[in-house]
Amino acid sequence: MTQRPWSKLQRKTHNIAALKIIARRSE
C-alpha cells in the first residue's frame, strides 16, 4: 500500500495547525 501521497501532506498540515495552537496558547 504505497498509494498514500495524502498522509504526508496531512501530517504536515496537522503539524502546522498544532504549532499554531501551541503558539496561540503560549502567547
Swiss-Prot record:
Pfam families per UniProt: YkiD
Induction context: Expressed approximately equally in exponential and stationary phases (at protein level).
Annotated protein name in UniProt: Protein YkiD
Organism per entry: Escherichia coli (strain K12)
